[in-house]
A protein has these predicted regions:
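Local cysteine-cluster metal-coordination motifs and their immediate loop/turn environment
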Residues: 41-50, 83-98, 122-134
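A mid-sequence, solvent-exposed acidic-amphipathic segment
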Residues: 60-95
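A short, acidic, amphipathic alpha-helical segment used as a generic capping/interface helix at domain edges
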Residues: 101-117
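Short, flexible loop segments at boundaries between secondary-structure elements
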Residues: 11-29, 83, 137-156
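Iron-sulfur (Fe-S) cluster-binding segments and ferredoxin-like electron-carrier domains
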Residues: 50-63, 93-104, 130-141
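Basic- and aromatic-lined ligand-binding clefts that recognize polyanionic substrates
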Residues: 25-74
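Single conserved hydrophobic/aromatic residue that forms the stacking wall/gate
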Residues: 2-13
Length: 156
């Protein structure tokens, strides 16, 4: 019986929340205000696997679904750090097996976000945000992390 119910479930296309909102719902406006400067965190997975933005190593016009969605939020200022899609160093087991390298990559990424003057680092990948939040806490930096869904939903 369970086999019958599960038949065809593998064919269901799974989408990341920003991909779904951007490509399927396609909002033209949001009744949300967030009067803050945010620095956009483009995760490796989001850029290179999910296509949430165009990777800098390809010679194509720049597009970014997260930036598009945040552009619908009133009063927000969106900036991006230098080397906007360089890895933050988390990468799952990489952070465990190469913790010193992972930590330095994360510090470098966080400092590039800090250099933008943003109050928040905003992204769609919880693991990247968690990694950077740990660095922010250890270094005592004056910047916070937020998942983009918190802003888009107005639940900040």
């Amino acid at each position: 019986r369970d086999v019958e119910r599960s038949r065809g479930l593998g064919d269901v296309y799974k989408r990341q929340i920003c991909e779904f909102v951007h490509d399927v719902i396609r909002p033209t406006s949001l009744n949300v205000s967030f009067p803050h400067k945010v620095s956009l965190q483009n995760s490796c997975h989001g850029v290179r696997l999910l296509g949430l933005s165009s990777p800098s190593e390809r010679n194509v016009p720049y597009a970014n679904k997260l930036r598009d969605l945040l552009g619908l939020v009133r009063d927000i200022e969106v900036v991006e750090p230098e080397r906007r899609d360089e890895c933050c160093g988390f990468g799952g087991m990489f952070a465990v097996e190469e913790h010193a390298v992972s930590g330095q990559m994360g510090r470098d990424k966080v400092m590039r976000h800090v250099a933008t003057g943003a109050e928040y680092i905003v992204g769609a990948d919880c693991s990247c945000l968690m990694h950077q939040n740990g660095i922010i806490a250890r270094e005592g930096l004056n910047i916070k992390t937020l998942h983009i869904a918190q802003i888009l939903s107005g639940n900040v």
